[in-house]
Amino acid sequence: MANRGPSYGLSREVQEKIEQKYDADLENKLVDWIILQCAEDIEHPPPGRAHFQKWLMDGTVLCKLINSLYPPGQEPIPKISESKMAFKQMEQISQFLKAAEIYGVRTTDIFQTVDLWEGKDMAAVQRTLMALGSVAVTKDDGCYRGEPSWFHRKAQQNRRGFSEEQLRQGQNVIGLQMGSNKGASQAGMTGYGMPRQIM
C-alpha cells in the first residue's frame, strides 16, 4: 500500500473482511487464462496475492489481455508502454478498465484503479477478470482462447413476439379452475393472528 500506514479498529476489520474474499484457486485459473489468452511470452507469476498484484500492477498484462479479445487491427489500446512511472502504470490500468466497459463488462463489476494499485481489494480485481472472461465466452466471436467451462456464459436476450391474433386467442382460454368447486380453495384458512379454533 503506497503511502498508507496500517489500519486499526473498524478499518482493520473491514480490510480483513475484504481480504477474506480473495480466492487463491481462482487466482491460478485467471493466471492460466491470461497467459493462454495473450499468447505472448508473459511470465507466470509466483502464487500468492502479493505476486498476483505485482504481476498486474503496471497494467501491461491487463492491456495485452483486453487487446487479445479483439480481432487484429481493432485493439482498443494501441500503445502499451512498460514504464516504471506510477502515473503511466495507473493510466494503463484505467485504459484497461475503460476498454473492459466498452467490451461489455458491467460498471458494477469493474474495480477501481486503487484496488489494484494499492492492493486494497484484489478480490474486486478477480471479479472484474471473471466478468471479462464471461463476456468473452458469451460473445463467442472467435477471439476467446481457453476452456469455455472456465467462465459462466451470460444469459442472452430471447424476446418473443406475439401477433394480435395470438393475443386474442389467449383471451378465449378458460382457466383450469373456473367453474369448478374442486381444487384449491380457502376453506379452513384463518386470518393472520387469529387463534385456531379446535372444538
UniProtKB/Swiss-Prot annotation:
Residues 178-188 have a biased composition (Polar residues). Residues 178-199 are annotated as: Disordered. InterPro entries: Calponin-like, Calponin_repeat, CH_dom, CH_dom_sf, SM22_calponin. Keywords: Phosphoprotein. It holds the Pfam family Calponin. It comes from the Eukaryota. The modification Phosphoserine is found at residue 163. GO terms for molecular function: actin filament binding. Residues 24-136 form the Calponin-homology (CH) domain. Calponin-like repeats lie at residues 174-199. Belongs to the calponin family. This is Transgelin-3.
